């Protein structure tokens, strides 16, 4: 009697016990990512529910709620705003608006992006142009920044700042000749351009970071050069609950800030790790992870740095989740918001200080 032929499912299940630990993890990740594509319709519904979470449609242009249906176009439902008289769909003002690529490709791009791939490698994996890969990344980051928000803190808050060198990448045109003594488009000779100032100067940008014991994180650009009190106050005012405890190093400005915002201030002296139960080790550890994260990109233009800080914040929020969950959350959050982002705005943007 002939043996019954194994089904594809039975063949796969019989091979799983023979896999090494690394191979099993690869297969498990592949299955998880395939599961996302199989349930793309559910993700699209979740995007719609998140976008209209208040129970009513909102105009992406004027944000009015007097909306009526306005027929369909290529099977896609259109809506009309009675206030501004503009027509829109569920995709209007999302990163994928006007894109001719499929949602599956956008999900694949998100997987590459969250895996830390460079813009060039993302383009190769998704078979898109490098320029397209660049603009997709920044459209997604703009949307994630809108969804994640600035952040509010309470209770015991650790605060500190870290510095990145000001990067003017993309702010000037290239010159053909770059020989000795030839001036660059920044007005300096190439020999002068190589020189870097030591210590804190206008060539460095201060990034403020604050973390409470509940895991809430506030991060953003404060100012260029040495930390200035008006910029420090602007960064924290309205984002730390009254009577919270602010734990910092011996940097100037935090004592005055605590008095004005009605906070309890604990100062950790230089050279000491902690004071009683108070310390800033969590925020120092965060700085280490941030530097590692940024080092993978080999120099980010300062005008785009705020978006990369929000990307880091997204990773911190979902660091305990599975890879597939991170991709799903990134897709829903980026597609459910109304970021004011276009190719023109990305090209002409300047550094945004919180």
Located regions from the model:
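Residue-level recognition of single "structural anchor" positions
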Residues: 1-354
């Amino acid at each position: 009697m002939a043996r019954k032929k194994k089904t594809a499912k039975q063949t796969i299940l019989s091979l799983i016990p023979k896999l090494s630990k690394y191979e099993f993890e690869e297969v498990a990740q592949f299955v998880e990512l395939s599961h996302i594509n199989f349930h793309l319709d559910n993700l699209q519904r979740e995007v719609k529910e998140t976008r209209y979470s208040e129970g009513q449609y909102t105009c992406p242009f004027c944000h009015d709620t007097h909306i009526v249906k306005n027929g369909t176009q290529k099977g896609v439902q259109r809506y009309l705003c009675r206030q501004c008289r503009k027509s829109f769909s569920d995709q209007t003002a999302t990163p994928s608006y006007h894109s001719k690529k499929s949602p599956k490709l956008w999900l694949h791009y998100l997987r590459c992006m969250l895996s830390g791939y460079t813009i060039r490698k993302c383009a190769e994996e998704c078979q898109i142009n490098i320029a397209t890969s660049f603009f997709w990344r920044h459209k997604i980051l703009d949307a994630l920044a809108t969804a994640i928000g600035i952040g509010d803190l309470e209770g015991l808050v650790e605060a500190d700042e870290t510095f990145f060198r000001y990067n003017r990448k993309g702010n000037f045109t290239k010159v053909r000749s770059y020989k000795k003594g030839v001036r660059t488009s920044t007005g300096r000779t190439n020999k002068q351009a190589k020189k870097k100032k030591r210590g804190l100067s206008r060539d460095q940008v201060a990034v403020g970071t604050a973390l409470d014991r509940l895991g809430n994180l506030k991060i953003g650009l404060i100012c260029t050069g040495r930390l200035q009190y008006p910029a420090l106050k602007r960064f924290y005012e309205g984002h730390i609950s009254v009577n919270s405890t602010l734990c910092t190093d011996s940097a100037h400005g935090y004592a005055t800030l605590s008095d004005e915002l009605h906070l309890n201030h604990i100062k950790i002296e230089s050279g000491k790790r902690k004071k009683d139960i108070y310390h800033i080790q969590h925020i120092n550890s965060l700085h280490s992870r941030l530097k590692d994260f940024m080092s993978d990109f080999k120099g980010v233009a300062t005008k785009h740095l705020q978006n990369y800080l929000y990307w880091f914040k997204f990773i911190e929020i979902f660091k305990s989740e599975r890879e597939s969950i991170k991709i799903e959350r990134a897709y829903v959050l980026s597609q459910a918001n109304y970021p004011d982002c276009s190719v023109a705005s990305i090209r002409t943007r300047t550094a945004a200080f919180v």
